[in-house]
Amino acid sequence: MHTPSLTLERIYPPQLDANNEDDRETLRIHLERYDFAATRLTGARVLDMACGCGYGSDRLAELNPDKTIVGVDIDPAAIAFAQAHYQRPNLTYICADAESFRSEEKFDCIVSLETIEHLPRPRQLIENCAALLADGGQIIASVPVTPTLDGNPHHLHDFSTRSFFALFRPYGLLPQERYEQIQWWQFKGLFQRRPSKLHRSEGVGNAVLAYYRKNPLYLLRRLASMLRYGFSNRYLTCRFRSPSV
């Protein structure tokens, strides 16, 4: 099975360098989000929406052998990788668009981590998740809550805590529990240029400068974030549920 090239769009654990601090931290915080979700799953059927290459779905299935886990992703290569590398008796994968995926059976819990900022129509994803959710079900989702558009070309939206919560409110889903994470920047290789990357974040500084040339006002947003939070990216994972449940 061919491992796709290094990008900032999806994480493939076999690509990550255990000797690189940024790679180690990236995998750690992603797995910690899944661990947060895994210990809060409810009901029998769980959907991992936009599951990527499947390492997170595998984590959910491993820690919840009594539940059926379904991983959905739009990328056929990611689903093929998941099927080849992350299989368990209670885990299946489907190649489908997160914004339009349908299922005859509802899901008791839907997990979608670091997905919303990648999509052109975030509200359409939340609307679809709400439609797929069983009565009394919950959604566990995450987004970055510091600027990321300058450093990651696959991110289409920035969110604050308030704007993140606002996506779910029209569907009667309110935040019940939150989990915050910090990832400090690693500067090694930030402006490196090579034909092929040695790690995911290599050369990101070049993309950042190019972004500011096209979007100079965004630099003010970045500076404001740096003054408040330092050289870090911050992430928020939240469990949403109807308050009447």
Question: Could you tell me what each predicted segment is?
Answer:
Residues 1-105, 109, 113, 123-126, ...:
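Conserved N-terminal segment of class I S-adenosyl-L-methionine
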Residues 114-118:
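A short His-aromatic
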Residues 124-135:
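A short glycine-rich, Lys/Arg-flanked "PGG" loop and its adjoining helix->strand segment in the class I
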Residues 137-143:
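Conserved beta-strand signature within the Rossmann-like core of class I S-adenosyl-L-methionine
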Residues 144-149, 181-184:
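Short "lid" loop at the C-terminus of a central beta-strand within the Rossmann-like core
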Residues 151-156:
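Short, solvent-exposed loop/turn segments at secondary-structure boundaries
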Residues 170-191:
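Substrate-binding/catalytic lobe of Class I Rossmann-like enzymes that use SAM or dcSAM, i.e.
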